[in-house]
From Swiss-Prot:
Xref: SUPFAM superfamilies: Nop10-like SnoRNP (SSF144210)
Keywords assigned by UniProt, alphabetized: Ribonucleoprotein, Ribosome biogenesis, rRNA processing
Domain of life: Archaea
Its biological purpose: Involved in ribosome biogenesis; more specifically in 18S rRNA pseudouridylation and in cleavage of pre-rRNA.
GO biological process: one example: rRNA processing
Record-linked NCBIfam families: PRK13130.1 (NF009623)
Alphabetical list of InterPro entries matching this protein: H/ACA_rnp_Nop10 (IPR007264), H/ACA_rnp_Nop10_sf (IPR036756), Nop10_arc-typ (IPR023532)
Family under the similarity heading: Belongs to the NOP10 family.
Name under which the protein is recorded: Ribosome biogenesis protein Nop10
Gene symbol of the encoding locus: nop10
Entry's Gene Ontology cellular component terms: ribonucleoprotein complex
Amino acid sequence: MKWKIKKCPKDCTYTLKDICPICGTPTIIPHPARFSPVDKYVKYRIEIKKGIKLNC
């Protein structure tokens, strides 16, 4: 599925473009990955998520 809205990780603005029009940073997809109950790597993602502090 192709997402339309994107987010700039530098200044936390939303846009429809691949490059942020304000700062020129490549944008990212702000939606989380799909959840699967049979995911064998969920433990590692939770550990990573707890260790990272987001500033947005």
